Amino acid sequence: MSTKKIIIDPITRIEGHLRIEVEIDENNVVTEAWASGQLFRGIETILKGRDPRDSGLIAQRICGVCTNVHYRASISAVEAAYGIEIPHNAEIIRNLVTLSLFVQDHIVHYYHLHSLDFVDITSALSADCAQAAEDAQIWCEHPYRNSDGHLEAIKEKLEGFVKAGRLGLFANGYWGHETYRLSPEENLVHMNHYLEALRIQRELSKAVAIFAGKTPHPQNLVVGGVTSVADMLNPQRLNDFLFIIKETRDFIERAYIPDMLMIVNAYRDSIKEGEGRAVGNFMCCGGYRFGKQQQLFENGVIKGHNFENIEPFDPSKITEEASRSWYENDAPLSPYDGETTPFYTDLNEDGSLKTEGKYTWVKAPRYDGNVMEVGPLARMIVGYVKNSPVIRPYMERFMKRSHMELIDFSTTIGRNAARAVEAQICCDYLFDTMSDLIENIKYYDETTWTKYVFEELPSEARGAGIFEVPRGVLGHFVR
């Protein structure tokens, strides 16, 4: 059997630091695949010997998209090491910022990173705008910005891009390919929401900045709490935040969820065939408290799609595997004992990866020796299986409308659907989280920082900050 190797370097949709090599057979089926992180970060090396209170500001430079979560996890790891408990208001403000990032990231991930794998922009140019407006009502009684006139304006804008030869980021699509399933009218509806999502994500950045100071790379976290005191006590700032979240919720309910229902319907056969299904190991660490005793996400571990058996999450079972990574130590180690000593072995003479040895700068995390899937799909499945009073009602509603079963979410389309459902949940529960803050302020609880004397803290300590974040589970371990 003859094989062909394809190399894609860089994968531009994830900031350009990933290389993929695949081998395909004569039927164009992928038989082997290797992923290689091509950038040495070295954040651990940079942090060694520094004041632990600075760890968050430095660690968040790992990524310009998900900066807040690295900032928070690093700060929380230091707090855990020193046994510092932050005030409830500080936890609320941290949750407001992080959950806003969840919603923004999910909208960007679907519309601006993934949707054009399903949506043919050139097909939208032949759409009947009146029919498009009517088709949108199949999935939502009152679709988002759905007038004939507005859709005509969107169509004219797209036509202008094409006629002027200024497709820009749309220039390299496989437009017209037979695997696109949407009608011209459905493509136009999607492109309408694609462009609207650009505005929504900009507004969500403003919401994050209200409490975080700025984004990316916010500045509001310190060991022991937050610095957003003036913003927390300013009614106008609170109203500005809520206004953006209300507008975002409207977009999710009248655009994002209906668009996912449309995609599920169009690609139902690929769902039933299990396209994109992985090994079925799901892991969640849980978290995000609101109200008295409730939390947004459940913790749990499911293996092999066995939804009848769910284990509690145990962070001590996490290890980092480096046998294929460009580091000296090959053994799987606890993150507390992890080593980041580079050992670069280069590529083959023809420029391909040395797939029999080391070929990436990225370590491979394992849970009890197993590969695990984390992120929206894992959280929605674990929450559903554990009968979460938060997650299960949203999942059941989407499953009823989409005619999906739980196993159907463990597919490429299903992951996108899970992300949309989670965006809706996070957006709704931002209001509950804000209510907790307002309730505390009403009863004169304005505490945002736990006082401590740094010089009196232990000279040796270790701690971990492990969180659910938009695209998975994030752990920062400090010693």
Across the structure, where does each feature detected by a protein language model lie?
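A translation/RNA-centric and nucleic-acid-associated enzymatic feature enriched
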Residues: 476-478
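Active-site bordering "gate/hinge" segments
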Residues: 1-473
